[in-house]
Amino acid sequence: MDKTELAAYACAVRALSRREHCAAELRAKLGQRDYSDEVIATVIARLKTDGYLSEARFAEAFLRMRMQGGEAPWLAAQRARQRGADESALQDALAAAQDDFDALRVCRDLLLRRDPQGLRHENERIWQRQARFLRNKGFDAATILRCLKENLQDDVSIAED
């Protein structure tokens, strides 16, 4: 490796030390620093050989991070695709992530985090705002309705106590 390749390699390792990246992200970052396509290709091949760059690790870490933030798996996968993640690694990570994903529980947790005082949606405006919030997180209409209806029943039973 010449000096330019070593500098590009060091730059890529620094980026990977902060978080996992896919090859497309590293290509873009190295391209912004005006490294040639040949140098970038060499560095990415070396990173894969050395075990520093893994599309599977990126897909797993990215999906886990987005899902912990309350996103539905399909939306997290879509965002990973936009970043250039490898499709086969993404499909494997998505299959594993969906096994442990309980959409209804995540919806409830999101709403409780958003409104710790309780899930009060007795007026339609608040109910619609909560539904829109969950839809923007990638949840389907059936899950959203089920979550909001269950929480409405919980609120009514709490009010009766």
Where are these regions (language model features)?
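An alpha-helical, amphipathic repeat domain used for nucleic-acid recognition
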Residues: M1-D161
